[in-house]
Design a protein with these regions (language model features):
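Short, flexible segments with low predicted structural confidence
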Residues: 98, 143-144
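Active-site-proximal helix-loop-helix substrate-binding element of RNase H-like nuclease domains
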Residues: 1-138, 149-157
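Short, flexible helix-adjacent loops and helix caps
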Residues: 135-138, 142, 164-165
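Extended, well-ordered alpha-helical scaffold/bundle regions in very large, multi-domain proteins
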Residues: 145-183
């Protein structure tokens, strides 16, 4: 028993991370391939970190944003909640895969079959939600709200998160005090 080394797990042959990135980048940056995700802004941050550069990923669709346009504040827009609400499916919880508290591990330490099941379920139910929500955009006459207003905000909000924003603290404090009085 060695207290100072990483636990040994059976090795499963895998492609090198750099090799996978080299294969996937052309797919993600191709303008002829539609990318469908849930909370895709998170994925854009990850891809930028992995590739070491800002990468334009278009065309894209985001089921979290679709849900927001169609449902507003009726309920949350997380994948787990939407899968349960619209597809009557309980998703595998991240904590079931990675643990919690002192037993929590990072996703790269998860057994390959568990990681595969978790990721495949996310992809599967994201696509199912897309197939459910996209026709509703047309039926509810919300296409322009989604395509012209909310979907473009994905990249704008990502840039704001990357760069930060300037805030006039005096004005913010005054607004806060005003809101507090009105509440």
């Amino acid at each position: 028993l060695d207290l100072f080394s990483e636990p040994q797990t059976p090795a499963v042959p895998q492609l090198k991370f750099e090799q996978v990135c080299k294969i996937l980048k052309p797919l993600f940056t191709s303008k002829s391939i539609l990318k469908i995700g849930h909370n895709i802004k998170f994925d854009l941050h990850f891809m930028e970190q992995v590739w070491g550069e800002e990468t334009l990923v278009e065309p894209l669709e985001d089921t979290a944003v679709l849900s927001y346009v169609l449902n507003g504040t009726e309920h949350g827009h997380g994948l787990d909640e939407l899968a349960k609400l619209y597809l009557d499916h309980k998703m595998i919880a991240y904590e079931e895969v990675c643990g919690s508290g002192k037993n929590k591990i990072t996703f790269d330490r998860v057994e390959l079959d568990q990681a595969l099941n978790y990721a495949a379920e996310d992809a599967d139910y994201t696509l199912r939600l897309y197939q459910l929500f996209r026709p509703r955009l047309f039926a509810e006459h919300q296409v322009s709200v989604y395509e012209d207003l909310d979907r473009p905000l994905i990249n704008i909000l990502k840039e704001m998160e990357d760069s930060g924003i300037k805030v006039n603290t005096a004005t913010l404090r005054a607004l806060s005090a005003d809101f507090e009085l009105k509440m």
